[in-house]
Amino acid sequence: MKEQTTMPNKLPKLEGCSYTDNLSTVKRQISSAASAARRSPAEISLVAVSKTFQADRIKPILASGHLFFGENRVQEAVEKWNPLKLLFPDVRLHLIGSLQSNKVSEAMALFDVIETLDRPKLAQAIARERDRTKQCPNLLIQVNTGEEPQKGGVLPDRIDDFIERCQTEFDLTVRGLMCIPPLGEEPSLHFGLLREVGRRHDVERLVVTSGVSSVRSFNS
């Protein structure tokens, strides 16, 4: 199972700095953290969370060469990114918000990665759309490692069965696992749980996140 870290950030504008300046600052921080961890910065990708940002505020970041972006809502993303992708066809979009079954067709046409697969009904809808279009984005299963009722994701005691159903009943390739550890708890415990699950099911990528201002892992 491979791990590659990315650090999503909503790129709040720092005092006296542009968004591109802020992006450069975050990338320098990532490079320093990678060196401290004896990892190559090339293994790390930054997913800029662009939800609620208008296209004119995203274009300078795209023009700077950044290609990885995360969105929460399908309809907002479709309206924003369909025109932008004509100008920047190499951009890679991650759906990081909950996906409703009736939005699957639009989501699969737009996103390169869906990070929030978490229930059989959604898996079935994705499989049907995959069969119809013969295409499928990378799929990540969200695991609710903290068993928090306000968060989406599969509970730990159900994750093995859900992965098996995705792989056998729906013939879906699970590319990774994602979790959002509870605030105030040691994240490594939750990341360790994902690693164990991933090894049991030969999932090749591990995705871990502490939200838009902290750490996310993804191997794109």
Where are each of the predicted segments found?
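Conserved alpha/beta-domain cores
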Residues: 2-216
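C-terminal accessory segment of soluble enzyme catalytic cores
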Residues: 219-220
